[in-house]
Amino acid sequence: MSKFFDDAVIFTDIHFGLKNNSKQHNNDCLNFIKWMIVQAHKRNIKKCFFLGDWHHHRATINVSTLNYTVDALQLLNDNFDEVQMIMGNHDLYYREKRDINSLPFANKYPNINIINDEIFEEDGVAFVPWLVDDEWKRLKELKSKFIFGHFELPDFYLNAMIKMPDHGGLKASDMSKAEKVFSGHFHKRQDKGNIIYPGNCFPHNYSDAWDDDRGITFLNWDGTYDFETWPDAPKYRVANLSQLLDDAGSILTNNTHCRIILDINISYEEANYIKETFATDYNLREISLMPSKKDNVSGEDWDTDGDVSVENVDSIVLSQLEAITSNSIRNETLISIYNDLHI
């Protein structure tokens, strides 16, 4: 069998434009790509595979975000001999068809190939765009050593809490002939059998709290692979105040977003002092204090500066969304939309 590659670097689900086209997030995306290129060059890797969801918003591309995209694509084009880019569901204007995507100009870069129109098979590999209609049935016929795609497989986790239900359609067993299957779409790193979800580039929100196993994947033709985590990635943490005061260094690091649950009584002045001190000492991106119970507020105006919320709002909302039973509404889609509301 001919070899499509000797070794390659893989990344997925970067989501340019997330958090209302946040400049901070887009800078994170660009800096991640610069870091990835450095790591690939250290190993003399010339091929790069992207497994879907370059942009976050399907209907519109913000002008600022577009400029970040152009810079990032130029970096990929200039630093790799070949870049295969799969279109994920977030890259498509319509979820159920692929005739319009948000990267129509990417093929203008000579070293970048967009995988959107159909399954691309060559020399022992298959690149599969977001599947529509009954295209999933074709995957049983693939005889490639490696399959790369953006698959929504049942019994894998969307995040630490939510497992993808079985809606019929594609299953992991449909790709059992492949030695390895690498997929974007689910942001949590996980594997089962020959299926590997390497995880997205870096944590995006509090559903990723304490889960930093994301970044890039190095794959060799012999099937061996290893992961590398971006050291400057943003992190998300949720912890009790008592834990924070006891061992802040194990919880807080540079670029951390954190929610601190007030499991001990403190005054409003003490709360402000804690926030200001830890934010400065650890170069935090965000710190918010959350009463563990509503009655812990004790009449004090905890919401004066907008940084403190009632207990477990996220878990309450997520549990309600997860409990919805409907033939026409996907719980995981609602959960994803809710998670993306956090800025």
What are these regions (language model features)?
Residues S2-D7, I14, L18-I119, D174-A178:
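Core catalytic region of metal-dependent phosphoesterases/phosphodiesterases
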Residues K42, N220-I343:
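Accessory, non-catalytic peripheral segments of nucleic-acid enzymes
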Residues L76-N79, K140-K143, A172-K177, I251-N254:
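Short, conserved loop/helix-junction motifs that constitute active-site signature segments
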Residues D13, I33, C48, D53, ...:
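Divalent metal-coordination and catalytic microenvironments
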Residues S2-V9, I119-F127, L142-F146, N194-I195, ...:
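Beta-strand-turn-beta hairpins that frame and shape the catalytic cleft
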Residues A160-Y225:
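Conserved beta-sheet core of the metallophosphoesterase superfamily
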Residues T69, M87, D91-S173, C201, ...:
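Conserved catalytic scaffold of divalent metal-dependent phosphoesterases
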